[in-house]
Structure formats: C-alpha cells, structure tokens
Amino acid sequence: MRVAAVSAHFGRDVEPCLAKIEAITADARVRGVDLLVFPDATIGGYLGGFGAVGATGMPPAFPADDPVFDRLAAAAGPTVVCLSWRESDAGRFFNSAVCLTGDGVLGRHRKVHQPVGEVAAYAAGDRFTAFDTPVGRLGMLVDYDKTFPEAARTLAGDGAQLLACLSAWPASLTDRAPRLAQDRQSRLFDLYDCARAAENQVVVVSANQTGTMGRLRFLGQSKVVGPGGDVLARTWAKAGLACADLDVAAEVSRSRLNLSHLRERRPEAYA
C-alpha cells in the first residue's frame, strides 16, 4: 500500500483550494497512492494569528453536508482522502476533518484540543473515534491534538493502525529561527509525529501547510512515520508529497511481536 502526506499552502479563496485539492488528488492517484492526507484547513485556510481575527478574517465555513464534499468525493474516487475545513453546525463552528472516497464519507473528527486564542474561531470537539476504511482502521488528529498522548492512544486503543494527522502548524511566534528546520516548533512537530507512532506502534501520516497566513508561517515537514518511530518519507519545508510504500498491518504486527505497548499497559497504576 502507498500512503502520502501533502505539504502545501491553502488560502482563503475557496475555489482555488478546491482546484488544488483536485489536482493533488489526481496526481496522487496516478502515482498509485491509496491513502492521501491533506493538511488542516484545506478549504479556506487557517487563521492568520491567535487571538484577534486580524486582516485575514475568519476562514469560510460550510456544513458537513455541503455539496462541496460531493465534489471532493468524486475527485477522490478509489483513493482514501483526509482533509479539513471550518465546519458550521447550528451556529457553532468546529475545526473539522473528514475522511472520504468516491463512495462517500468514511469518518469524521472535530478538533478537541485548542491553543490559546483559537476559541475565537472554533468550538472544541469532544471525542476520538477510529473507523474502518479500505486501507485499514484509521483515526484522525487535527493539529494540536497530537501534542496530547491520550488522543493518539485512544485511537490506537480503538483499533486504529493508521493515524492521519492534519496540521496547520506554524513556526514559533516568539523565538523564530533563521531557517524553518532549526525552529523550535519544527523540532516539536517532528518529535510528536515520531513519539505518537512509536508509543502506539502505529503508522502516522502527518500533513502540514506551507507558506504564510497573516502572522503565521507554516513549517511544512509533512512525513510518514513507521510504527517504530522511524521517518519513512518527508517533504522537509517544501511543498510536495511524502510517499511511502508499506504493508501497514504487517508492519504494525511486526513492531508488536515482542513488545506490545497497548497490551502491556497497566492503567490501574496510572490513577
């Protein structure tokens, strides 16, 4: 199976975002990609900063049943595609992810963990649930969710062997490095991807935005991480696809052959 994480910029204008999603998906299908994970805020971009709305304004919002998702499902065809947008639901807004193919929606997730200031744009989700897909049982994390070990552990405990991490992760706002690869947030972004994969012995497909939005400069660094925490493919700070070929079930099973972290947990000692 071939899995891929997208590293690209998605701005405020919806139609160019949709066209870019369609073009990247078509290219990935030609390249034999079975699972394609896009960054956070794929439709309409992320915030331009934390706190005040700023000059970039709020991202556009769509309900979960908007016809735009029929268009994107048609573009996905046989490929399993994960992407993200600002969801509107009865006057509330969520940072949401959807997983779909040409047959329709396979699963959804609303971002649970919010950095300071994000409450101005989004309400918080309240659960982590894995679901079955043609490429295996999968769970989704949006951006800051992956900072918290319990989030990925909950999905792994629910049977997920693949974690799709959709991010709009920026460089540090307070201590910027001259190069993105040297930035403190770049190191943390990589650390979380590798740690969540290794501690749960799952495959992590981590996508991130590039470019800038308002005050935020996004890191890129999309990657595929194996269940031992090893990086199998990455884009570094550039736009592109991080692609890796692997038998997910076999790799996960092999990583758990001698040490099985989920089986050997002692939750009664953690209280």
Where do the model's predicted regions map?
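Cys-nucleophile CN-hydrolase/nitrilase-fold catalytic domain and related Cys-dependent amidase chemistry
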Residues: V14, E22-G102, P170-C194, E199-V202
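Active-site catalytic loop in hydrolytic enzyme cores
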Residues: S88-A177, A181-L191, S253-H261
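Extreme N-terminal starter segment of soluble prokaryotic enzymes
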Residues: M1-A4
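Short polar catalytic/cofactor-binding loops
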Residues: S7-V14
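C-terminal/domain-edge helix-coil "capping" segments
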Residues: L257-A271
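Short beta-strand scaffold segments in enzyme catalytic cores
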Residues: L83-W85, N95-C99, T129, S222-V224, ...
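CN hydrolase (nitrilase-like) catalytic-core segments centered on the catalytic cysteine
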Residues: D66-V80, T147-G240
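Residue-level detector of high-confidence beta-strand sites
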Residues: R108-R110, R234, C243
